[in-house]
C-alpha cells in the first residue's frame, strides 16, 4: 500500500541552508520507489491557521520504503540543512481509506 510523505514548511530562518537542502535532496531519492507529486507550488490555506510557507507531497511504495529513505545515509546527511534552515511539520501517512467510522482515529475516543 502506498504511503505519503507530507512536509509543511512553517517558517524559514536561514534561506541559504534551505537552498543547500533543495539542491542536495533530489539525488537522495535515487534507488527508492518514490514519486514526487508536488513541491513548493502555489497553495491556498483553506482551513486552520498558518504559517505555511510551502508544501511537499511525495508518494512511496510503502511506509517501510519511506522510512528506509528517511533513515538512509544520503538523506540523513542532507536533512540537517532543512532542519537548520526552516521549521517543518513532517508527516508520513499510510495510503488508503479507513472505511469503518469506528476504526477512524481511535486515540480520540473517550474512555468509559
Residue ranges of each PLM-predicted region?
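Short S/T/G/P-rich N-terminal loop/turn motif that feeds into the first structured element of a domain
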Residues: 1-54, 61-71, 94-112
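C-terminal structural segments of small proteins and small subunits
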Residues: 76-91
Amino acid at each position: 500500500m502506498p504511503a505519503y510523505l507530507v512536509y509543511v514548511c512553517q517558517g524559514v530562518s536561514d534561506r541559504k541552508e534551505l537552498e543547500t537542502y533543495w539542491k542536495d535532496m533530489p539525488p537522495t531519492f535515487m534507488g527508492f520507489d518514490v514519486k514526487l507529486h508536488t513541491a513548493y507550488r502555489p497553495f491556498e490555506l483553506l482551513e486552520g491557521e498558518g504559517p505555511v510557507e510551502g508544501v511537499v507531497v511525495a508518494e512511496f511504495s510503502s511506509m517501510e520504503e519511506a522510512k528506509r529513505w528517511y533513515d538512509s545515509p544520503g538523506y540523513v546527511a542532507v536533512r540537517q540543512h532543512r532542519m537548520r534552515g526552516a521549521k517543518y511539520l513532517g508527516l508520513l501517512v499510510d495510503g488508503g481509506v479507513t472505511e469503518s467510522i469506528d476504526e477512524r482515529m481511535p486515540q480520540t475516543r473517550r474512555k468509559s
